[in-house]
Amino acid sequence: MAASRRTAEGNGIRYGVFTAIPMIVYTIVAALAGFLGKIEAGSLNVVIIITGVVLAIRNLRTVKGHHLGYLQGFGTGIITGLVASVLLGATFWLLGGIDQAAVAQVKARDLFGSDLGILISGLGIILVGTMTSVITSLIAMQYYRTPDESQSEVEDVD
């Protein structure tokens, strides 16, 4: 009964936390192993966000009995990516506060000072994760939207 009343926002927060957990574990492992500075290492986090967004939209559609409005699915996908990205960014800031050497791998140039470099990097993580979730939600909702919901068409009014 409670599952049928699940909201898009609650589903997004729930799946955002579920998505953040493997991203945080992977980031900590990458920092400890010394390959956090490789650009390719960050691409796995993008794949994890894409997977989390699609699973969140799919779950909400299943819970709603395959009657999912476009904006509900779009919203749950964005919230999923935003929550996961904020948690990953906070983990990055915490990691930077605990172990400067681990985060130093990421800095190409220290243009704004060491503290601001960590701050900007965390904000960049949030921005990239959120924009990835927006694009993924747009694409996924073309597949998961309700079948009777047609594309908006321009109608001639005579």
Regions found by a protein language model. Name each.
Residues 13-17, 75, 79, 119:
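Internal alpha-helical transmembrane segments of multi-pass membrane proteins, especially GPCRs
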Residues 115-136:
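Hydrophobic alpha-helical transmembrane segments
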Residues 1-63:
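Transmembrane alpha-helical insertion/packing segments
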Residues 101-119:
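Short, membrane-exposed interhelical loops at transmembrane-helix boundaries
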Residues 76-94:
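Hydrophobic alpha-helical membrane-insertion segments
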Residues 61-80:
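Alpha-helical transmembrane segments with an aromatic anchor "belt"
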Residues 147-158:
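Short, highly charged, low-complexity non-transmembrane loops/tails of multi-pass membrane proteins
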Residues 26, 30-34, 57-61, 88-96, ...:
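Membrane-water interface at transmembrane helix exits
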